[in-house]
């Protein structure tokens, strides 16, 4: 996250969500690497939430640990490791290996879905490299067979 230019106000993918005060207050209870489920008993009555919401998917990133698999949708993005807000589209994209200048299109919700549904670019690249090696090997085998004939 330290590679992101937070001063660039033109990057709409780095605009944080406008959370309600209650949501922000709930986020304050989540420890780094933890989730809301771990702190349910400590929430004041006015911050209590349904069991559906508290399944444990509202978790805070830990700067010293690997990020979890991100899933589609802004409400599924984890809480920022330090700030009391969900991570931005840009932060989610950087975590999954997108280049810093990658541009997402569509509504905020669609851009979140694009990141959450994407195969992480470094993984896609590694798969592509192996596919090329395999296909090159097939070509080499065909050449060897043709030369033997």
Regions found by a protein language model. Name each.
Residues 1-149:
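C-terminal target-recognition/interaction regions appended to catalytic cores
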């Amino acid at each position: 996250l330290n590679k992101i230019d937070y001063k660039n106000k033109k990057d709409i993918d780095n605009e944080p969500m406008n959370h309600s005060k209650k949501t922000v207050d709930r986020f304050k209870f989540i420890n780094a690497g933890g989730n809301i489920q771990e702190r349910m008993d400590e929430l004041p009555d006015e911050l209590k939430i349904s069991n559906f919401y508290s399944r444990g998917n509202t978790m805070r990133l830990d700067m010293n640990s690997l990020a979890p698999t991100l899933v589609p949708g802004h409400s599924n993005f984890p809480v920022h490791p330090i700030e009391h807000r969900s991570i931005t589209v840009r932060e989610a994209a950087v975590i999954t290996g997108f280049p810093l200048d990658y541009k997402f299109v569509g509504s905020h919700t669609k851009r979140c879905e694009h990141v959450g549904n994407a195969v992480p670019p470094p993984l896609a690249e590694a798969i592509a490299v192996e596919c090329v090696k395999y296909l090159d090997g097939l070509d080499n085998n065909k050449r060897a067979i043709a030369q033997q004939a």
